[in-house]
């Protein structure tokens, strides 16, 4: 698991020391993954700094840079977008579901450009650790709404995963969704 927090501080390589830190972090992660002969890598992308606004051009450039650098590895990527790494999603997520939908659309444009290296997108940006639980947007209706927005924004070649069998059943029950694009991730002990 490799985590990155998108910011508005980094601009272009060589002009900001933060890019050097990011590049060093990515290089170390790619090298670690390669030395372990990993074929899959989970990247967590934290959007917390943008809970109250759209992602900026700098943040989107940062996401693109992260994905481009990971293309140097032999790993396929599992991506999880989140607003919380500390189990406090209700205090760190956007106040309005439309902001999450906007973030989904913004990120999907870049993900589609890197679809050949992406195995799947895990979750729908909400919940503690991005795991779709303990969110203010946890109702079945809201989860289907968010899933529909993300699925409609992603290229058909990018799979999506939900957290539990119940979430999978709910999404499949929405008659406009194609089950060929879905996987479900087994629950963790935190789901109890």
Show the residue positions of the predicted features.
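Boundary/entry segment of secreted carbohydrate-active catalytic domains
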Residues: 1-32
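Aromatic-lined substrate-binding rim segments of carbohydrate-active enzymes
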Residues: 23-34, 43-82
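Surface-exposed, active-site-proximal loop segments in enzymatic domains
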Residues: 47-59, 84-99, 129-137
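An active-site-proximal structural segment forming one wall of the substrate-binding cleft
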Residues: 59-71, 95-120, 146-149
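Active-site groove signature of glycoside hydrolases
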Residues: 78-87, 111-137
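Aromatic-lined carbohydrate-recognition surfaces of secreted/lumenal glycan-active proteins
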Residues: 118-128, 156-171
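Active-site neighborhood of glycoside hydrolase catalytic domains
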Residues: 140-160
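Conserved small/polar residues in nucleotide/adenosyl-binding loops
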Residues: 184-191
């Amino acid at each position: 698991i490799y985590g990155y927090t998108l910011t508005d501080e980094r601009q272009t390589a060589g002009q900001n020391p933060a890019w050097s830190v990011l590049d060093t972090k990515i290089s170390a992660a790619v090298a670690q993954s390669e030395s372990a002969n990993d074929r899959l890598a989970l990247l967590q992308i934290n959007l917390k700094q943008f809970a109250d606004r759209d992602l900026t051009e700098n943040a989107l450039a940062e996401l693109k840079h992260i994905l481009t650098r990971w293309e140097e590895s032999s790993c396929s990527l599992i991506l999880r977008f989140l607003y919380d790494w500390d189990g406090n999603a209700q205090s760190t997520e956007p106040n309005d579901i439309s902001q999450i939908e906007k973030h989904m659309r913004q990120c999907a444009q870049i993900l589609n450009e890197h679809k050949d290296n992406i195995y799947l997108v895990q979750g729908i940006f909400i919940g503690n650790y991005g795991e779709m639980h303990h969110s203010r947007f946890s109702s079945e209706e809201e989860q289907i709404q968010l899933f529909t927005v993300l699925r409609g924004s992603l290229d058909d070649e990018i799979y999506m995963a939900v957290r539990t069998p119940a979430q999978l059943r709910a999404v499949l029950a929405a008659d406009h969704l194609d089950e060929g694009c879905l996987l479900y991730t087994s629950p963790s002990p935190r789901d109890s």
